[in-house]
A protein has these predicted regions:
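Basic, polyanion-binding surface patches
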Residues: 2-179
Length: 179
């Protein structure tokens, strides 16, 4: 029985799935690399399904396809890291999306080993290290909840974004009613 059937989820008709996929492609998302280490083996992959969850306790969630190697790894390891890429790291994103063999991915760029064991990108726009607090399967993906144990950020970089199958970056801040 599939995870979808086990949860009682009825797959939508193809036209809704296709329309939803097209709609979601238009949601701009920050590009990240999620990394973890299991038994001395590092692994990481590019992901955009990352969001803050709570400030008390500080936490975020990531969503990973159930068929990925990192998904299985995160079910076993207690912690993971999220490195938010800069607008100058498109090639790194592509490499961690499959253009570089998994065992060679951390040879590119300035990865450093965090005190908790996993690799974190030193030149990232921001990075967050989390303790895995939960994993909720839903359909083809699992939502991993991470409680923040460490974080750092740069004041001088621009985040890399992805929208409609293209990399992009914020151009400028727009005025708000407060400024």
């Amino acid at each position: 029985m599939s995870a979808t059937a086990a949860l009682g989820i009825v797959p939508p008709p193809a036209p809704i799935s296709d329309a939803f996929r097209s709609t979601m492609r238009r949601f701009p998302a920050t590009v990240t690399i999620i990394s973890a280490c299991r038994n001395g083996t590092d692994h990481g992959m590019t992901a955009t399904a990352v969001t803050s969850l709570s400030m008390d306790p500080p936490s975020l969630l990531i969503c990973l396809n159930n068929r990925t190697y990192l998904h299985d790894m995160l079910l076993e390891v207690p912690e993971f890291a999220v490195s938010i890429l800069t607008d100058r790291q498109v090639a790194l994103s592509e490499g961690f999306s499959g253009k570089i063999a998994p065992e060679r991915r951390f040879e590119a760029a300035d990865w450093v080993r965090h005190a908790r064991g996993m690799m974190v990108l030193d030149s990232a726009h921001a990075s967050v290290v989390c303790r895995r607090m939960g994993a909720v399967p839903y359909g083809t993906h699992t939502i991993f909840i991470g409680q923040v144990v460490d974080t750092r950020f740069s004041q001088d970089t621009i985040p890399l974004m992805y929208e409609n199958s293209k990399y992009c970056a914020p151009q400028h801040a727009l005025p708000t009613s407060q400024n």
